[in-house]
């Protein structure tokens, strides 16, 4: 055993062993407990960042621990390889996205391997390869034929210069992020998944996920947004509208119906179109609204604007004429594109009515009273007793809901309804680097799904996009085809799928990645699924996790899987943060500086008091701790850390610095501390091994001091098992090992029993560290005399007898102040402890002249004598 810890050699040897032995390749083993551990697969952006390292290390620790429990563990990895960054890189570098993507995958795979992950690479999937997306297209055609996927016009952000659709986040101040062109709203045909058909189940089956963070479930509940309310019809005023009919609105507050003073419609609503005829001012306002963002969050925060129309509707219960306004805060795709406005009890309506001088009529008595003077108060939105509401005055919320519903139903002008905030999922993208949509457009037959024997529709990989529109729409060799039904000339769909589709089912494909008979091989899928532990960032709480849950239910209903949910347990790891430094330019712009280029001055307590740029010695501003990012230049290259310290040090620091679900603050000194600790472990083991093999431990012959050392060993096992296995608090498990190391380093090594005890201690340290620092553990286990690799060793079990103490040292207090200690047999009764405390010489001294009023015994810990 080499005298010095040499991580480069140790890690290379361990990784070579695992590769040659195919240590992490698994197959279905009926009758053996399985554990499927999965970290969200990466986008092949080019290089790993510290967020990746943390994510995959957490997954690896869990996987290796479960393997040591004797389970058949699957931990696969692959690549979420379609998407916009590849197109942008292709445009910038004049290279095909496929080439860029595959080169990045090769580089990042080597980086991941250098971390020593216990991954079954034989199951690697790459979503941009036809053998993967072929099955996505197959499922698409099945769902299209069932009506779960349909085509309709949708409103999108259209960039007239680039001739392409932009996501909401690509529209900056109303302009395209790349071209700078003013964005238009445009209606184009798009494909949609009917996720709303599963809204109830997606909501209710959240209750079947006790292993998910409550925060994530709450976010999904809010996103699905089920609300019970009423559909209310406001009859048209025929004199102004010119025809019979009714304006439909949905409200969750029918109790406030008597306080409605106007109605507001979205810019796209038919009444808005009607009112704009011959009204250029209104038409201009409608065009302005249509040019705004289609994102709900943006609508919520923008200034509330509106225009009156000459149209009126009638109040369904009073017949009063209410004016129709066009307002920018009403969304056409939510509800019916119209709202009944009750300014006294709704903040948006209040803001709007105050601005435009519209009536505000309070109809609910709230904790703020019967009036609603400006400014808006949250109390105005409370439920309460009705006032100013005619026959409904005096009713509470539920009674008013029921009575007003009955009155509306009687007049055929309303009914109760459950509504969802969730919208159907539009998946059409006018992009090149995505999965082709397997539909053929035929003038005679309409939209025809591509037959199974003609799948996959292969995306040509030699295309270099220029950023202007969809390249596929300019490639007759791609879109010209024959109709699968009638054989006539037809046109292939040139839109590609949203890349969230690929990541919605990849976890299932890992169960049988090479299966050519279907999307999954049913036996394998049902053997491994659902995933036992899923790990990823909280930023995926809604879209990805909701879409994956939806897809799992689609696959279940297609008979592909039998479970209802894809992921039993979810761990959302925290971010990796680091210090930021910048200089403020005269323009007011911040120029960010890499921490590696900064020299710090610290005070006696190691607090940073000033920072200078190393190259010029001039001051820089300290920006505080923020998430590692390219823009702030505070990222640390994992490869540099691995090259300098080794993967085990990086893994140990990541696990020790913070609980996995909390943010982790990067610290160079923390990394160095982790490295020093591994050197200590190596040094102690090397010194022990150098003395030759130790004899077996004779537990019955242990001295009291040796029993104390052995107790520390088994306390560490008990606590670390609880920390890793039950609480996923890897940081406290590492702390237990560090505490044990302190004991072992001080332990005598004189007798054979001493050396046998140290052997047990070092084996325990090795096993407890094995999931976290697998390379050094692999080498130590061999050096400690074991033939089988540490990955096949079982997780240690604590010896309950070792934890039993023959005697206990108890604290003695007089009136709450420490006055000494007494040694007592562990079996001593309360009375014996009290008697021993009373005759302790310190107690006698501090109670001299006082009367002992009470003796409080806390078993195993302390005795407090109350005297006065």
UniProtKB/Swiss-Prot annotation:
Entry GO terms, CC: cytosol
Residue positions binding ATP: 630
Record motif 'KMSKS' region, residues: 627-631
InterPro entries, sorted: aa-tRNA-synth_I_CS, aa-tRNA-synth_Ia, Leu-tRNA-ligase, Leu_tRNA-synth_edit, M/V/L/I-tRNA-synth_anticd-bd, Methionyl/Leucyl_tRNA_Synth, Rossmann-like_a/b/a_fold, tRNAsynth_Ia_anticodon-bd
Enzymatic reactions: tRNA(Leu) + L-leucine + ATP = L-leucyl-tRNA(Leu) + AMP + diphosphate
Keywords, comma-separated and alphabetical: Aminoacyl-tRNA synthetase, ATP-binding, Cytoplasm, Ligase, Nucleotide-binding, Protein biosynthesis
Motif ('HIGH' region): 42-52
Pfam families attached to this UniProt entry: Anticodon_1, tRNA-synt_1, tRNA-synt_1_2, tRNA-synt_1g
GO terms (BP aspect): leucyl-tRNA aminoacylation
EC number: 6.1.1.4
Subcellular location: Cytoplasm
GO molecular function: aminoacyl-tRNA deacylase activity; ATP binding; leucine-tRNA ligase activity
EC main group: ligase
HAMAP family: Leu_tRNA_synth_B (MF_00049_B)
Family: Belongs to the class-I aminoacyl-tRNA synthetase family.
Protein name (database record): Leucine--tRNA ligase
Organism: Pseudomonas savastanoi pv. phaseolicola (strain 1448A / Race 6)
Lineage: Bacteria, Pseudomonadati, Pseudomonadota, Gammaproteobacteria, Pseudomonadales
Gene: leuS
